[in-house]
């Protein structure tokens, strides 16, 4: 995005006074990335059900606003999960910038305690309903499941966005660590295996919060 642009748009480094929306309090590592690349960070207050969407809807009328960071489930550091209404309002956004992107970091998608786990509707299908197929990148990883910094990661998005990302990534890596991918598949086997593994984490952590 910084050097090549997104889907034919101007590279972000050429956009003067570029801005990025940051729900606060939030994840400092996210904010540090966009700060490093010269973005003005705009604070968006977190409410009890997610970011202040009225403020987001107003700010994206500026075409120098290029994106927003989101941790939609158990958001750092408050633990808030976005409501269905907030997710739908995200999916219905009409930003001035064609290359505005929601960076949807679903880092805690499998991190409930016991049978109690917040549910969140699928942002990608909601975007499709609003003809905003390209507006979101959704990320997840096993960093907080298996090995911090040495697990596996995934991104979900529209076919156009994924083709765009593949075009960037082919210059930075020959391919993923397939042995590590196989290691994870053989250990977990399926989604039930992931759930069972996470309950072991829960058994260790839950007493600290009781």
Feature locations, PLM:
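Conserved core segment of the aminotransferase class I/II
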Residues: 125-206
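Short, cationic motifs built from Arg/Lys/His that form the positively charged side of catalytic pockets
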Residues: 86-87, 151, 208-209
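Hydrophobic "anchor" residues on beta-strands that sit immediately upstream
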Residues: 67, 101-102, 137
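Serine/threonine-rich low-complexity intrinsically disordered regions
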Residues: 11, 61-62, 96-97, 161, ...
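Conserved core of the PLP fold type I
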Residues: 1-98, 109-130
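Arginine residue identity/basic-tract feature
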Residues: 18-19, 29, 88-89, 101, ...
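Walker B catalytic acidic pair
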Residues: 105-106
């Amino acid at each position: 995005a910084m050097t090549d642009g997104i889907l034919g748009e101007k590279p972000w480094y050429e956009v003067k006074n570029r801005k990025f929306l940051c729900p606060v309090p939030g994840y400092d590592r996210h904010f540090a990335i966009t700060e490093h690349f010269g973005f003005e960070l705009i604070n968006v207050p977190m409410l009890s059900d997610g970011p202040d969407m009225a403020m987001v809807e107003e700010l994206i009328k500026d075409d120098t606003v290029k994106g927003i960071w989101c941790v939609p489930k158990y958001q750092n550091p408050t633990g808030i999960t976005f409501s269905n209404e907030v997710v739908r309002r995200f999916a219905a956004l009409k930003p001035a910038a064609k290359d505005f992107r929601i960076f949807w970091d679903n880092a805690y998608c499998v991190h409930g305690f016991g049978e109690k786990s917040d549910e969140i509707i699928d942002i990608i299908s909601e975007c499709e309903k609003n003809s905003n197929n390209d507006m979101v990148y959704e990320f997840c990883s096993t960093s907080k499941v298996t090995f911090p910094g040495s697990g596996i990661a995934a991104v979900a998005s529209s076919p156009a966005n994924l083709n765009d990302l593949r075009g960037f990534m082919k210059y930075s890596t020959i391919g993923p660590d397939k042995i590590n991918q196989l290691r994870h598949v053989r250990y977990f086997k399926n989604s039930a295996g992931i759930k069972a593994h996470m309950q072991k984490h829960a058994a260790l952590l839950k007493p600290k919060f009781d």
